């Protein structure tokens, strides 16, 4: 059977389920596909199919992730669900599954648990901008006051981590009952909570700005000179667009950015009017010598990104089984940090009270690089030793 093609007429949003183990994330994911399938907006994905998620590799790290897609009247969604807690940590830190918003699943019978807190903290750290809550297993709670209490606890917890706890939509229901019923009717006692949840996701999580509409940035992968014409920097445009005559800055590996003008844009030896996010292009740069630009720098819209040496990050350290270190590291650890296209040595400062970091841990650290790199919040990087990946991280703040 030919695969159905999703029409790209609707805005696209990436979301995922987060929350404590056994609170019903995977059941909810299955229930969403079953209810939306009744109106032809999804293909049914059974629980065990989602739970046995395939392994993927991102930045040398193995992560189990299930991907489902579905649509509502308004949008097309790509939804990620992870079987294990460690998979969430890795997923959120590596950005393997970038989330524009998340559905936090909390069991009404248990209330917020340790991983509920940890996932909210991670979402705050790695920049998941919006959260909608599904209060699950409501069929197991007879006392409406208890439901109100859990509702309050969840809102307080979200506010603790600087999410707007009072405004966040909380939908109460039972994913298991909705999955077992799967009639998909909006008036159904169980299926209606799934519709309410999808309405909340549609309304509350805004459509993200497309990469093409953001300020131009292209990591420099290679540089060569064309006799009589000048220097060409090649790379894949990460965001925004570039055309002939645009002023750009060369940022990184130097203390100050350098301005230049793009005098030509080519793709596969053909001249382009404009290069956009996702294109592999060569940019001809005015008055720049072959020696004045190198791999590891970026071309960017002037003023949009600056070179920095000091920043804070949330990192995940690979286990021995994942090919990482066999031993812990301590304050003053000096690995290489791989940003976009290049390795830069840096020194690690551990948080107060943390003596050492073990393989398999995730921790917040401060890093001081020996040379400045174009850095901003949300930028992902790998931690390497001698070309081997030993960790992954995301920039959570700049310290100057």
Swiss-Prot record:
CDD domains: EF_Tu, EFTU_II, EFTU_III. It is an enzyme of class 3 (hydrolase). SUPFAM superfamilies: EF-Tu/eEF-1alpha/eIF2-gamma C-terminal domain, P-loop containing nucleoside triphosphate hydrolases, Translation proteins. Keywords: Cytoplasm, Elongation factor, GTP-binding, Hydrolase, Magnesium, Metal-binding, Nucleotide-binding, Protein biosynthesis. Residues 60-64 are annotated as: G2. Belongs to the TRAFAC class translation factor GTPase superfamily. Classic translation factor GTPase family. EF-Tu/EF-1A subfamily. This is Elongation factor Tu 2. It comes from Pelotomaculum thermopropionicum (strain DSM 13744 / JCM 10971 / SI). The gene is tuf2.
């Amino acid at each position: 059977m030919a695969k159905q093609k999703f029409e790209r007429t609707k805005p696209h949003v990436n979301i995922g389920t987060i929350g404590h183990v056994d609170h019903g994330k995977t059941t909810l994911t299955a229930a969403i596909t079953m209810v939306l399938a009744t109106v032809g907006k999804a293909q049914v994905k059974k629980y065990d199919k989602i739970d046995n998620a395939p392994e993927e590799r991102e930045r040398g790290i193995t992560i189990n992730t299930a991907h489902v897609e579905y649509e509502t009247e308004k949008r097309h969604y790509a939804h990620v669900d992870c079987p294990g807690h460690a998979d969430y940590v890795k997923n959120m830190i590596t950005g393997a599954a970038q989330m524009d918003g998340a559905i936090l699943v909390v069991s009404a019978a248990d209330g917020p648990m340790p991983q509920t807190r940890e996932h909210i903290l991670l979402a705050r750290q790695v920049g998941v901008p919006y959260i909608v809550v599904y209060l699950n297993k409501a069929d197991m709670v007879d006392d409406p006051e208890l439901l109100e209490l859990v509702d309050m606890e969840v809102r307080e917890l979200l506010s603790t981590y600087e999410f707007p706890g009072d405004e966040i939509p909380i939908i109460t229901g039972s994913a298991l009952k909705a999955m077992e019923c799967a009639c998909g009717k909006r008036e159904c006692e169980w299926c209606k909570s799934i519709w309410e949840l999808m309405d909340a996701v549609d309304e509350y999580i805004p459509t993200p700005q497309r990469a093409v509409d953001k300020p131009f940035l292209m990591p420099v992968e290679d540089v060569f000179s064309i006799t009589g014409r000048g220097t060409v920097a090649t790379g894949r445009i990460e965001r925004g667009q570039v055309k002939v005559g645009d002023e750009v800055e060369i940022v990184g590996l130097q203390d100050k950015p350098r301005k230049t003008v793009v005098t030509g844009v080519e793709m596969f030896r053909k001249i382009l009017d404009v290069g956009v996010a996702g294109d592999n292009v060569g940019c001809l740069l005015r008055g720049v010598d072959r020696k004045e630009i190198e791999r590891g720098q970026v071309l960017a819209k002037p003023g949009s990104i600056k070179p920095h040496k000091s920043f804070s990050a949330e990192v995940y350290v690979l286990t021995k089984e994942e090919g990482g270190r066999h031993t812990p590291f301590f304050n003053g650890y000096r690995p290489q940090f791989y940003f976009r296209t290049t390795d830069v040595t840096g020194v690690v400062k551990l948080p107060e009270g943390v003596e050492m970091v073990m393989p398999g841990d995730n921790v917040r650290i401060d890093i001081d690089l020996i040379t400045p790199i174009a850095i901003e919040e949300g930028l992902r990087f790998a931690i390497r030793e001698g070309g081997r990946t030993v960790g992954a991280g995301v920039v959570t703040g700049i310290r100057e």
